[in-house]
C-alpha cells in the first residue's frame, strides 16, 4: 500500500476558510443557519467553520453533532449519540463532513436530521469530494475535489482526533 499526503495543514486551513466564505456569500440570513457536523471528523470541521464565521462576521452560529450510525442501511446500532441543542425546524441546516464518496453517509445524516425537525433547507459542505456516487447527492461547498480510483482511499486526519491536520490518499494495489 502506498500513502501520499495530498493536503497539508496549511492547505486544509485554506480550504476551510474558503468554505466559510462561500457559506457567508450564499446565505443572506446567516442568523437562520445551523451547522450540523457528522461524527466524528465532520464535527471538528463544523467547529472550525463556526470559529471562522465568528472571526469574520461576529456570529455564534449554533452547532449540532449528528450520529448517522443508527440511520445507516449497512449497520445495526441501537444507541444514537446525536447532540442537537437547537430546534432545526425552519432553519437552514448545513451538514458538514470530511469526505463525500458514495453519498450513503449523507443520506443517513439527512434521515437523522428530518427525524429531529423540518429544516427550511439542507445543504452540504465537505472537505473532500472524491466522486464515485451511488446516490444522487452533491456537495454545495467543497474544500477540495480529489478524483480517486476504486482501489484508492482518502484518509482525513484532524488534530483534535489524530494529532495533525492532513489528507492522504492510500493506494491498496
Swiss-Prot record:
Residue stretches in coiled coil: none
Motif, PRPP-binding: chain positions: 93-105
EC numbers, comma separated: 2.4.2.9
Swiss-Prot/TrEMBL catalytic activity: UMP + diphosphate = 5-phospho-alpha-D-ribose 1-diphosphate + uracil
GO molecular function: RNA binding; uracil phosphoribosyltransferase activity
Record keywords, A-Z: Glycosyltransferase, RNA-binding, Transcription, Transcription regulation, Transcription termination, Transferase
Pfam families (UniProt xref): Pribosyltran
Residues where substrate binds: 40-41, 97-105, 130
Biological processes annotated in GO: DNA-templated transcription termination
Record has Zinc-finger as a keyword: no
Highest taxon of source: Bacteria
Signal peptide: none
SUPFAM superfamilies per the UniProt record, alphabetical: PRTase-like (SSF53271)
Subunit-level organization: Homodimer and homohexamer; in equilibrium.
Function: Regulates transcriptional attenuation of the pyrimidine nucleotide (pyr) operon by binding in a uridine-dependent manner to specific sites on pyr mRNA. This disrupts an antiterminator hairpin in the RNA and favors formation of a downstream transcription terminator, leading to a reduced expression of downstream genes.
HAMAP family, per database record: PyrR (MF_01219)
Similarity comment: family membership: Belongs to the purine/pyrimidine phosphoribosyltransferase family. PyrR subfamily.
UniProt xrefs under NCBIfam families: PRK05205.1-4, PRK05205.1-5
The protein's name in its UniProt record: Bifunctional protein PyrR
Amino acid at each position: 500500500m502506498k500513502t501520499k499526503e495530498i493536503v497539508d495543514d496549511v492547505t486544509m486551513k485554506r480550504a476551510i476558510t474558503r468554505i466559510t466564505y462561500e457559506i457567508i456569500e450564499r446565505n443572506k440570513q446567516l442568523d437562520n443557519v445551523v451547522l450540523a457536523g457528522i461524527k466524528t471528523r465532520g464535527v471538528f470541521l463544523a467547529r472550525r467553520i463556526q470559529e471562522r464565521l465568528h472571526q469574520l462576521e461576529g456570529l455564534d452560529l449554533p452547532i449540532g453533532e449528528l450520529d448517522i450510525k443508527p440511520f445507516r442501511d449497512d449497520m445495526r446500532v441501537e444507541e444514537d449519540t446525536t447532540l442537537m441543542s437547537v430546534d432545526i425546524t425552519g432553519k437552514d441546516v448545513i451538514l458538514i463532513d470530511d469526505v463525500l464518496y458514495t453519498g450513503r453517509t449523507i443520506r443517513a445524516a439527512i434521515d437523522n436530521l428530518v427525524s429531529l425537525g423540518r429544516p427550511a433547507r439542507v445543504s452540504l459542505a465537505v472537505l473532500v469530494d472524491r466522486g464515485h456516487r451511488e446516490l444522487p447527492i452533491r456537495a454545495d461547498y467543497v474544500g477540495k475535489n480529489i478524483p480517486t480510483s476504486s482501489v484508492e482511499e482518502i484518509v482525513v486526519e484532524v488534530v483534535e482526533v489524530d494529532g495533525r491536520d492532513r489528507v492522504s490518499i492510500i493506494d491498496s494495489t
